[in-house]
Amino acid sequence: QAVYRDQWNNVTNAYRTGSVNAEFKMPVGKVNDFITVGAQILYDRAGTISFTTTHILPALNYHKSLSSEHNRYLSLGFMGGWVQRRFDPSKVTTNSQYDGGGLGENFLNSQYSYIDGSVGMSYNSNIGADPNNNFYIGGAYHHFNRPKNNFYRNATIELHPKWVFSGGLRMGVTDFAYITVQADHSRQGG
């Protein structure tokens, strides 16, 4: 899957985001177990100072079949990789410059990188005999390694872990129509 988006083009140097995601399914062991291997690559650039974020995050997931007769899986997944953020300090304008002063900011670095990691688990199953009726529930813990997240090299500023809980239900109404309900809840920081 590939996605590209321009946002707010009437603003100087609008947001430009590109993303490529891929996942490959491979059977493993007996019964219906399988693993998926994938990656998420994201590039985002915004604003006059060219604030840019790049993510390269490979993923590995194991899906354990809990029934040979029904579609029931318990899944465990890991995603982690490299993230970089940067900007062009020559394009920064601060209030000190309007008063005849210099930049007024002490940027030791105009870029930084870190390793980020996430883990998640989900359960999905058919409802009844119809394989088109199903549900899922899951949870994920993002940024479990608490990477440092700032341009000033301040060791106390970190990306706080985030919990995400998800659930969904799909039920057939007719042979050609379904009702789908999904919900997510996330919590990050304190």
Regions flagged by a language model, labelled:
Residues 1-190:
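Subset of outer-membrane beta-barrel
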